């Protein structure tokens, strides 16, 4: 990576990481305030937990499109200011309705799509996958850190203080955007990172992609439903006051990451990727069942939580990588945009439905719902044949001697391991989907003037 790419990745990882850290901080504590906020019922608490997912799903594509017109940095600044405003409103709230409004504003500053677009502007194709992975890892780290620190901060500054802190974090990210994120004079639209409305229908008709979309929806639906019920389980089963919940989250999350890493490494071997996915979903089902039968059972609750976090951290890391290897070369941005939309919808559905179930049926209702949803997912994972995992290559046609594009397509298709060819003559780019076991970059040297980006 060159200096501009390293600077861009560091700055954008910090910006997105700070924002997501602020969103995740309240997950382990908000449900415990059901008796202290005016109008708060379990159902309304669930809506407050998940509301940011609904507005994020609605605004992520518009934010990306607006950044094409008005520039990346102005939209990043606008998104962070919306997040800070939502945090202030939630911090000053005395009723659950105002908390929900604040959470909605937090989610409406949907800068993730803008960050991806800016990464496309500032990184070369051969570095882009690594760049996206590094930015994604900052979100994963933010999630783990927030679950550990949320209960500790709650004990010190309370829920209002946490919301004030999240607003401050958003404002701290503003100087990073203004002074450290490299400037882009002419934002580009790249099909490998940005959505296109015309491709949405085609992506939704792809069964393999729809299967992954539904999977990420279930995963985040279960996550949010759990955080309606689990804090009360810690109170009642472990008889642990909320200012000591960190004593469970910290060791359980640490042990879960240690158990997850070997499985994630194993998944990097092509023939093991899909079996590891199936194992992760199976562990998630077992976790739901263990938590269901662990009423008043301290050991069962801790084991169930550990299994849940093993499964969640594994699937959260594995699924985006698997998704990127399944999507059509020219539709990667659209496919990942749809995938993220399903994820955010899962956040909202899980929070709202989990809260309603907890209010009517208690924790058992939440865990039964989660187990049924994951069981359906597991049946699909086992029943669906493992797909052939391909990789993307982007080819620069600027200096190609052959200008007959139909002839170029025929030449590309004649190379060993090439499964799909999409030419964009206006951009002098070709997208290839290749079998990495059969395709070798050196084979392009036979085509005059052709080189990988």
Where are these regions (language model features)?
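Conserved MFS/SLC helix-loop-helix module at the cytosolic interface between two early adjacent transmembrane helices
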Residues: 58-94
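Helix-to-loop junctions at the C-terminal end of transmembrane segments
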Residues: 60-71, 259-273, 358
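Residue-level signature of mid-helix packing/kink "hotspots" within the transmembrane helices
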Residues: 53-61, 143-144, 253-261, 347-348
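Juxtamembrane intracellular "pre-TM" segments in multi-pass secondary transporters
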Residues: 1-4, 182-213
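C-terminal membrane-cytosol helix-exit motif in multi-pass small-molecule transporters
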Residues: 168-187, 377-385
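Cytoplasmic helix-loop-helix junction between adjacent transmembrane helices
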Residues: 102-139
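Short amphipathic helix-loop junctions that connect adjacent transmembrane helices
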Residues: 28-42, 228-244
């Amino acid at each position: 990576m060159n200096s501009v790419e390293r600077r861009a990745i560091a700055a954008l990882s910090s910006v997105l990481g700070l924002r997501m850290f602020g969103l995740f901080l309240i997950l382990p504590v908000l449900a415990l305030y059901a008796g202290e906020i005016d109008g708060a019922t379990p159902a309304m608490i669930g809506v407050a937990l998940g509301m940011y997912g609904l507005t994020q799903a609605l605004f992520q594509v518009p934010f990306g499109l607006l950044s094409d017109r008005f520039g990346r940095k102005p939209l990043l600044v606008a998104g962070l200011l919306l997040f800070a405003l939502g945090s202030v409103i939630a911090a000053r709230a005395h009723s659950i309705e105002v908390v929900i409004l604040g959470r909605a504003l937090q989610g409406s500053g949907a800068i993730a799509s803008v960050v991806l677009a800016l990464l496309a502007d500032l990184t070369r194709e051969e570095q882009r996958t690594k760049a996206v992975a590094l930015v994604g890892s900052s979100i994963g780290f933010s999630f783990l850190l927030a679950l550990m620190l949320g209960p500790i901060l709650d004990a010190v500054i309370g829920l209002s203080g946490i919301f004030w802190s999240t607003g401050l974090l958003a404002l701290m990210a503003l100087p990073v955007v203004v002074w450290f994120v490299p400037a882009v004079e002419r934002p580009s639209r790249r099909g490998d990172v940005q959505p296109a409305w015309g491709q949405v229908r085609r992506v939704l008709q792809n069964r393999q992609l729809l299967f992954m979309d539904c999977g990420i929806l279930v995963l985040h639906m279960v996550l949010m439903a759990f955080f309606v019920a689990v804090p009360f389980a810690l109170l009642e089963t472990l008889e642990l006051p909320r200012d000591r919940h960190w004593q469970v989250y910290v060791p359980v999350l640490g042990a879960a990451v240690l158990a997850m890493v070997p499985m994630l490494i194993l998944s990097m071997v092509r023939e093991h990727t899909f079996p590891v996915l199936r194992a992760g979903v199976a562990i998630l089902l077992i976790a739901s069942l263990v938590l269901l039968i662990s009423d008043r059972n301290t050991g069962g609750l801790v084991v169930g939580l550990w299994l849940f976090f093993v499964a969640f951290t594994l699937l959260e890391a594995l699924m985006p990588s698997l998704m990127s290897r399944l999507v059509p070369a020219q539709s990667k941005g659209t496919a990942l945009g749809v995938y993220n939309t399903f994820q955010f919808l899962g956040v909202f559905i899980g929070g709202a439905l989990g809260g309603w179930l907890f209010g009517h049926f208690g924790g058992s209702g939440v865990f039964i719902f989660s187990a049924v949803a994951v069981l359906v997912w597991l049946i699909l994972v086992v029943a669906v044949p493992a797909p052939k995992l391909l990789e993307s290559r982007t080819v620069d046609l600027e200096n190609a001697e052959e200008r007959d594009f139909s002839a170029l397509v025929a030449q590309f298709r004649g190379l060993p391991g090439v499964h799909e060819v999409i030419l964009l003559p206006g951009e002098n780019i070709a997208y290839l989907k290749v079998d990495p076991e059969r395709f070798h970059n050196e084979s392009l040297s036979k085509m005059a003037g052709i080189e990988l980006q």
